[in-house]
Every structure is written in structure tokens, then in C-alpha cells.
Curated annotation (Swiss-Prot):
Keywords: Cytoplasm, Methyltransferase, RNA-binding, rRNA processing, S-adenosyl-L-methionine, Transferase. It catalyses: adenosine(1518)/adenosine(1519) in 16S rRNA + 4 S-adenosyl-L-methionine = N(6)-dimethyladenosine(1518)/N(6)-dimethyladenosine(1519) in 16S rRNA + 4 S-adenosyl-L-homocysteine + 4 H(+). Its EC number is 2.1.1.182. Specifically dimethylates two adjacent adenosines (A1518 and A1519) in the loop of a conserved hairpin near the 3'-end of 16S rRNA in the 30S particle. May play a critical role in biogenesis of 30S subunits. One of its GO terms (molecular function) is 16S rRNA (adenine(1518)-N(6)/adenine(1519)-N(6))-dimethyltransferase activity. The keyword Magnesium does not apply. The keyword Cytoplasm applies. It holds the Pfam family RrnaAD. S-adenosyl-L-methionine binds at residues 27, 29, 54, 75, 100, 138. It is found in: Cytoplasm. This is Ribosomal RNA small subunit methyltransferase A. The gene is rsmA.
Length: 302
């Protein structure tokens, strides 16, 4: 079956009486060149374990299976599971998993390949080096941001994520301070990953065609996160609160999560070279980390 042929894809969907759901972001990639560019960006190797979220018809899954050790293809829609059994069910290294990617316990999922040590928040290799654990997906648009943040927060030791996302989402991932797209997701991802846009994807390479353009982004895990593990949960809370209202100053946004007075917070900022009236979107990621560490060390967190 030629999954790069819109006509054959249409026939396949009709055979299973499936009408793609916009609510699930079901626009299927039908361009082999784009598939190969995604695989090249991920630098897939035969030792790699790949998480693929939203495999759809299995187009990317099938091509990746020739390059890697194992694939965990996680699909929410039971109708797609039936198709995947036909298109990639015969691939020995593809595990089709019917589950919600936003609720799945990823550490449990890959425990057969990696032994986790919660006390050290690290992982010890069983069968593979953690550097060989990657996520490669044409993500359903509606889950892109929450999924990537979930993987970061839960410390799933992914060395690389290569993801196709809506262009608007990619712009938020890679935004610069002061821009309209710069927000909490930008800051948090940059703390854990080096984020780059790889290439744009036109809507014409999908069936059915979406209304928006896409972009493939690459997130490479930093050798050391910008915030120590012990403080990451509080830092995430801090950053989210800093962008709670873009029209408010940083001090006014974060006041509710600290026990200190507003004047004390303002004074701390000014003593360290920052304006008391600065807003979250004006700060670089490194400045966010710097301010958090200063305030955290001087005022008890509520």
C-alpha cells in the first residue's frame, strides 16, 4: 500500500469508514521526502528507542522502523489502531499502544529498556544508552505544547525530540524575549532543551489538507538544565505565574506565590539590576533563572 498517495489513503480511510477528525488533528502526511527529512533531523540509529505520539496511518512509523531498535507508537483513536495493525502490525520492532499521550506514564512504558533511579532523578542503562531514547512525531496540533511540557516535567530522559507542529506552536517554542509569541512554554523548554526550527512544511503535503502551515522543530536535551532538579517544580510554578497576565509587572504576577511584601520583591529586583516594573516577556531565560534563584533564596516560598 502506498501511504504517500492521497488517493490510496482516501480509499484506506473509506474502507475503515473513517472520517478524519479535526478535533484530533488528523491530517495525514503523504510526502516521502518530508518523512526522510524528519528521519535525518532525528539522526536515527539502529540502537535508538523512539516514542511516536499520534502515528495516524503509520506512514512515519513504517519508515522509521527500518532505522531503529524499537518504536512505541502511541495512538488515542481506536479507529487508527485498527489501521495501524494493517500498515505496521507486521513490523517486529513496532509496539502499537492504545492510550492517551497526555496521561501515559512514560517511565513505566520504557522501563523494560531503561531502569530509573528516582532518588537521583537519573537513569541507568539496561539494554540501551539513554542517549538513544528519542521522540519523533507528527504531533496532533492540539497536544503539542502540553505534551512537550509533560515530558520535560516528568524527566523522561529523551536526548532529542524532533516534532512536526503547527507553525504557530513552533513560533512559541522558538520565540525571542519581547515578541508576542514569547511565553511560559518558551522559557520552560529553553531551560531543558536547545530548541531550533528545522524546516517549514507546506499544508499541501497532508491529506486532508489543514488550514495552517507546519514546522519541524528539534529539541536537544541540555547536558545540564538551567535550574537544579531540586527547584524545578517551584521554577515551573514561578514561570507560569510570571506570564499569568501579560499586562501586569513581574512583581504583581508573582506576588501571590511568595510570602514577601511587594516592596520587598521590588527592592530585590532593583538591587540586582532589574527594574521593579519589568514584565515577564522582557526577560531572557537566563534572567528568569537568575531572578528565581535570588528571590527563592531570600523569601520563603509559599
Amino acid at each position: 500500500m502506498n501511504l504517500f498517495s492521497p488517493k490510496e489513503v482516501s480509499q484506506l480511510l473509506k474502507r475503515y469508514e473513517i472520517h478524519p477528525k479535526k478535533s484530533l488533528g488528523q491530517n495525514f502526511l503523504v510526502d516521502g521526502n518530508i518523512i526522510q527529512k524528519i528521519i535525518a533531523a532525528a539522526e536515527l540509529k539502529e540502537q535508538d528507542i523512539v516514542l511516536e505520539i499520534g502515528p495516524g496511518l503509520g506512514t512515519l512509523t513504517r519508515d522509521m522502523s527500518f532505522y531503529v531498535n524499537e518504536i512505541f507508537a502511541i495512538e488515542l483513536d481506536q479507529r487508527m489502531i485498527d489501521i495501524l495493525q494493517e500498515t505496521v502490525g507486521s513490523c517486529d520492532n513496532v509496539n502499537i499502544i492504545h492510550n492517551d499521550a497526555l496521561k501515559l506514564d512514560y517511565q513505566e512504558l520504557i522501563s523494560d529498556f531503561i531502569e530509573f533511579s528516582p532518588a537521583q532523578l537519573q537513569c541507568k542503562s539496561k539494554q540501551i544508552n539513554p542517549k538513544n531514547l528519542k521522540a519523533v512525531s507528527n504531533l496532533p496540533y492540539y497536544i503539542a505544547s502540553p505534551l512537550v511540557l509533560k515530558l520535560a516535567k516528568e524527566k523522561v530522559p529523551l536526548s532529542v525530540m524532533v516534532l512536526m507542529v503547527q507553525r504557530e506552536v513552533a513560533d512559541r517554542f522558538t520565540a525571542s524575549p519581547g515578541s508576542k509569541n514569547y511565553g511560559a512554554v518558551t522559557v520552560l523548554l529553553d531551560c531543558f532543551y536547545e530548541v531550533e526550527g528545522v524546516f517549514n512544511v507546506p499544508k499541501t503535503v497532508f491529506y486532508p489538507q489543514p488550514r495552517v502551515e507546519s514546522q519541524v522543530v528539534k529539541l536537544t536535551k541540555r547536558s545540564e538544565a538551567k535550574i537544579n532538579d531540586d527547584y524545578q517544580e517551584d521554577f515551573i510554578k514561578f514561570v507560569n505565574q510570571a506570564f499569568n497576565s501579560r499586562r501586569k509587572t513581574l512583581v504583581n504576577n508573582i506576588l501571590s506565590i511568595f510570602t514577601g511584601e511587594k516592596s520587598e520583591l521590588s527592592q530585590i529586583l532593583e538591587n540586582n539590576g532589574f527594574s521593579a516594573g519589568i514584565r515577564g516577556e522582557q526577560l531572557t531565560v537566563d534572567e528568569f533563572a537568575q531572578i528565581f534563584k535570588i528571590i527563592y533564596n531570600r523569601i520563603k516560598y509559599s
